[in-house]
Amino acid sequence: LYKLVKVVLNM
């Protein structure tokens, strides 16, 4: 659930 958070922050 870390990569997902990074992707959302990248948005």
UniProtKB/Swiss-Prot annotation:
Recorded superkingdom: Bacteria
GO BP term, pick one: defense response to Gram-positive bacterium
Keyword Transcription regulation on entry: no
Record's comment on post-translational modification: Contains a choline moiety at the N-terminus and a tenuazonic acid moiety at the C-terminus.
Temperature section of the record: Retains >80% activity after 15 minutes at 100 degrees Celsius.
Keyword Chaperone carried by entry: no
pH dependence: Active between pH 3 and 11.
Keywords recorded for this protein, A-Z: Antibiotic, Antimicrobial, Fungicide
Its job: Has antibacterial activity against P.solanaceum (MIC=10 uM), X.vesicolor (MIC=100 uM) and B.subtilis (MIC=5 uM). Has antifungal activity against P.capsici (MIC=15 uM), B.cinerea (MIC=25 uM), V.dahliae (MIC=200 uM) and F.omysporum (MIC=50 uM). In P.capsici, inhibits mycelial growth (EC(50)=7.89 ug/ml), formation of sporangia (EC(50)=0.6 ug/ml) and cytospore germination (EC(50)=21.96 ug/ml).
This protein's name: Antimicrobial protein BL-A60
